Amino acid sequence: MLSLVLTVFFVHVAIYLVNTIGASTIDSLLWLLYLKLPTPTSRTARKQQQLKRQVLEQKHEMNSTSSQDEFAKWAKARRRHDKSMEEYEALNKTLTAQKSSFDWTVKIARWLSTNGLKIFLQFWYSKTPVFPLPEAWFPYYVEWIVSFPRAPLGSVSIHVWSNVCATTIALTAEVMGALLVQIVGQKKEQRETAPVSAEGKKAQ
């Protein structure tokens, strides 16, 4: 079983990833993955896509047929198109309702597994020391601050550890992002200067 130290840390990693990537992006990705599963919803989605292609093909056929010179053929194509369009719109409404229900379920599950879990842990373990401080290393006021609000004096409370994790993760991600941008910029600069150097040697 994970210790309280790692549990709180991983919860904050999850919260940071959700906030960075974006809840809507995660919801869309999970929806696409859900549609890959053998469920009634995925079958509805496949049928909707088939009808969409069928509607476009029938519309193209109808537009390429003259309503004056070939009225009977055009009218038949129009009836087929209208029927397919009705089926497509009905399936689209069904799929939209299913997606709304899916998004709501995912939203609840995401909150419970991130912020909800964080709040629960802070409440449930409010009096539990996350880890003890070395004896006589810190003055009284420091021990009081890091044990705030309800942990035993001389230990780190879950509230303080939670804030430390959130700050550390955010700063680490920011530093890594800055380093990545710098590395990519240097490589791009090297690629741009390489052809210039080669042309200079040829000219000599």
Swiss-Prot record:
Residues 43-99 form a coiled coil. GO terms for cellular component: endoplasmic reticulum membrane; GET complex. It comes from Penicillium rubens (strain ATCC 28089 / DSM 1075 / NRRL 1951 / Wisconsin 54-1255). Keywords: Coiled coil, Endoplasmic reticulum, Membrane, Transmembrane, Transmembrane helix, Transport. It is found in: Endoplasmic reticulum membrane. It is a multi-pass membrane protein. This is Protein get1. It comes from the Eukaryota. PANTHER family: GUIDED ENTRY OF TAIL-ANCHORED PROTEINS FACTOR 1 (PTHR42650:SF1), TAIL-ANCHORED PROTEIN INSERTION RECEPTOR WRB (PTHR42650).
